[in-house]
Each structure stands twice: as C-alpha cells, then as structure tokens.
Curated annotation (Swiss-Prot):
Sample GO molecular function, one term: cellulose 1,4-beta-cellobiosidase activity
EC number: 3.2.1.91
Main localization of the protein described in the UniProt heading: secreted
Designated name of the protein: Probable 1,4-beta-D-glucan cellobiohydrolase A
Residues that carry a glycan: N81, N284, N333
Keyword NAD in annotation: no
The gene coding this protein: cbhA
Length: 446
C-alpha cells in the first residue's frame, strides 16, 4: 500500500507534527464540479482531489528508511508518538500507477486493487492547500455514479465529515503537510487506524491487524460528525447521518473512542451506527440492484437534499434520476415506520422497530447533525471491510440474527461473500466512478 521511492527527503524543523517529504512532487488530479444557483444556472468550478495521508509512503525526513512497513512502525524512528512526528514525513503520490486513481474532466475513477495497494480515499480541494468546504443546510448535493463494477463486500462511498479545512496545519506548529498531503481525517467511528493524529504519530499502543497486512489500531482515535451521502455497491446502498457531541474534530484515547475499533462500541462521543436508510433493509427488496427500479448495471444520478426548519436540519431527502426519469426514494415497508426520507420521527420509529439502541438520539440526532453541516469536507473512497465484511450494508447482519426479523436483512449477498481475502483476490479489478458533481440550493441541480 505504501509507495517506496528512492529520492532524497529534506530535513524539516518541527517540534511535533506530521511532515511533508520531497521525494516525489505532489500533483493533485484535477476534478471539475458545478456550483448552482436557485435560478438553475450552474457554474463550473476547477477543483482537484488529494489522497489521504494514511495511504502515503511514510519515511525518515533525512533519508529513505520506511517509518512504517506493512502494518508495523520502525522502532528506531518511532519509539513514541512525538519522536515519530519529528522523524517521519509523508510524501507525494503517483495517483494512477500506485493507487489506481484517475480523473477526466468531471469524472473520478477509483480502482480497488493496484499492485499491492488496496482501496483509496481522496478529498475534494478548493486549492492546493485547502479542502473545499460545504454548507449543506437548505442545499442539495447531486452526482452521477457507476457501481456496476462493485460486487458484494465492496463500498464505493461518497460522504462528508467535519475535518479542518487545512488538514490541521494551523493547529500544530511546524506541520508542513496539511491538506496538501491529505492530513486530518476524522469520522464518527473515531478511527484508531490513522497513523498521525493531531500532529502526533499514533505509535504508542499500536497493535498490527491480524487480518489486514497494511493496517493496525493505535492508542489514539480521531472523531467528528459524518454525513454518509452514499455507501454502496451494485447490490445495496444506504445514506446515514452520524452526529457527535462536538461539531469539530477531536482526539480520543483507547476504548473511550468507541466505534468499530474499540471494545466498547458506544463508549465514545460519536454515533457509530447513525440513522440509516437502506431500501432493502426498509423492506423494499426490488428497488435497488441489477435490473431493479434503480438499475445498478448502468450509471444513474443521486440527489440528496438537506431541508432545514428554522435553521435546524429537519429532513434529508433522496431522489434518483435514471434514463431521464426522476425516481423518489423508496417508501418504508416496515410496520410502524413510515416515510421515504430521514427525519427524527423516522429514526425513532426505525430504532424501535429494529430493536436497536437509539445512540443516534443520545448524540443529538438530526439537530446535532445539522449543527455540524455548515462546514464539511467531501470524501470519496473505495474500500473493503476487515471488521464485518460489509455485511452491515449488503447481507444479513448481525450474523447470528434471524434474517426474517425486521432490520436484519440488508441485501442479497451471502454471508462471507465480502470477506477481504475473497474480494481482494477475486475482484481486484473492481472500481467505482463518480462524476457530474453539482451543489446548490434545493431544486437547482437536477
């Protein structure tokens, strides 16, 4: 996963922070998108994307030695968190050759496996040093997507989180990496697999993964609100708000982070489950998939509207457009749960019907999600799941639950079909293509 270059990296003077190397020039692939007005007119914006720093070659600032190889840190360069930040730098990326990331005009394709690299995550940039920030309230976000080459167990995701616009550059003295090198990631799982958090290496307490040759779990995590516009493959899709107690990125420690990476899933300051709308899970098994109403064998358009009432987020609506037809989101077919959009009433009823703990409400629900929605970064990714094989998206989950019970079945994939060993060997050529991104007031983009 991590690029090995053979060029010199300059020594950078910092006290603590993630540093930028100079072995390879960082050139962001261009990606145009459109900003629309209430009148319906749209203006093209010349943007670009940047690769997340977690995927990058991490090496000594004054040489070629890997700070991180496979899923382990170099004990000499990284004996502790602060020393690691002083001694190590992340470097530029060869987007296509190493990571399988290509762009063409308004289109971005992410390949699943390229050489030894698995998956990728990129952010939309305003300029070379700053992430593009979005204010979602009373606006809509629209894009085209082709998921026809995404089988069971894969996730071609498009979502927003409350990352810092500069990747944390201004918060940590001497940080020479920042958004230009894709730093500062956070989400509602409070992920602990991030190598550098808040200008420090995540070395102390690091445990290499037993199943993922490129990853591990450290002593720190990084939390922030997350709005999943699109988590999908060709079989299933879901959109999900995940609020947190803080609207900004925060650091956590150990199991108090909660989320996927901790023993106490609900022990943190964020909602790792969210309030999801998955049409299959909501009882409409013929709405989305190959040959379905939304036919995933060909490209289609996804529209998501963030409706505010008195300045507070009150509803998240979904429409699709395919073959020139506007298609509203499917209606819930679950007894006791009404509607085809995410509202506070829908979320409460859904948690009750499925017997799920209402962590969403405990962390402020839609109102808290709306509080965070004024400044969010756009993220596009392709990934597989070493924790639950993506069964929460496209199969029956939990694995020991009766699939006939409400909320258990989320798609038609067999349990185990998404095992990373299976998908990485049998579907290495998988990919997702996002294109034609538009953003503007409700009703302006389609």
């Amino acid at each position: 996963m991590y690029q090995r270059a053979l060029l010199f990296s300059a020594l950078l003077s910092v006290s603590r922070a993630q540093q930028a190397g100079t072995a390879q020039e960082e050139v962001h692939p261009s990606l145009t998108w459109q900003r629309c007005e209430a009148s319906g007119s749209c203006t093209e914006v010349a943007g670009s994307v940047v690769l997340d720093s977690n995927w990058r070659w991490t090496h000594s600032v004054d040489g070629y030695t890997n700070c991180y190889t496979g899923n382990e840190w170099d004990a000499t360069l990284c004996p502790d968190n602060e020393s690691c930040a002083q001694n190590c730098a992340v470097d530029g990326a060869d987007y296509e050759a190493t990571y399988g990331i290509t762009s063409n005009g308004d289109s971005l394709t992410l390949k699943f496996v390229t050489g030894s690299n698995v998956g990728s995550r990129v952010y939309l940039m305003e300029d070379d040093e700053t992430y593009q920030m979005f204010d979602l309230l009373n606006n809509e976000f629209t894009f085209d997507v082709d998921v026809s080459n995404l089988p069971c167990g894969l996730n071609g995701a498009l979502y927003f989180t409350s990352m810092d616009a500069d990747g944390g550059l201004s918060k940590y003295e001497g940080n020479t990496a920042g958004a230009k090198y894709g730093t500062g990631y956070c989400d509602s799982q409070c992920p602990r697999d991030i190598k550098f958090i808040n200008g420090l290496g995540n070395v102390e307490g690091w445990e290499p993964s037993d199943s993922d040759a490129n990853a591990g779990v450290g002593g720190m995590g990084t939390c922030c609100p997350e709005m999943d516009i699109w988590e999908a493959n060709s079989i299933s899709t879901a959109y999900t708000p995940h609020p947190c107690d803080s609207v900004e990125q925060t650091m956590c420690e150990g199991d108090s982070c909660g989320g996927t990476y901790s023993d106490d899933r609900y022990g943190g300051t964020c909602d790792p489950d969210g309030c999801d709308f998955n049409s299959y899970r909501m009882g409409n098994t013929s709405f989305y998939g190959p040959g379905a109403i939304i036919d995933t064998s060909s490209k289609f358009t996804v529209v998501t509207q963030f409706i505010a009432d008195g300045g507070s987020l009150s509803e998240i609506k979904r429409f699709y457009v395919q073959n020139g037809e506007v298609i509203p989101n499917s209606e819930s077919n679950i007894s006791g749960v009404e509607g085809n959009s995410i509202t506070s009433e829908f979320c409460t009823a859904q948690k009750t019907a499925f017997g799920d703990e209402d962590i969403f409400a405990q962390h402020g629900g839609l109102s808290a999600m709306g509080d965070a929605a004024s400044a969010m970064v756009l993220i596009l990714s392709i990934w597989d799941d070493h924790h639950s094989s993506m069964m929460w998206l496209d199969s029956s989950y939990p694995t020991d639950a009766d699939p006939s019970q409400p909320g258990v079945a989320r798609g038609t994939c067999e349990q185990g079909a998404g095992d990373p060993d299976v998908v990485e060997s049998e579907h290495a050529d998988a990919s997702v293509t996002f294109s034609n991104i538009k953003f503007g007031p409700i009703g302006s983009t389609f």
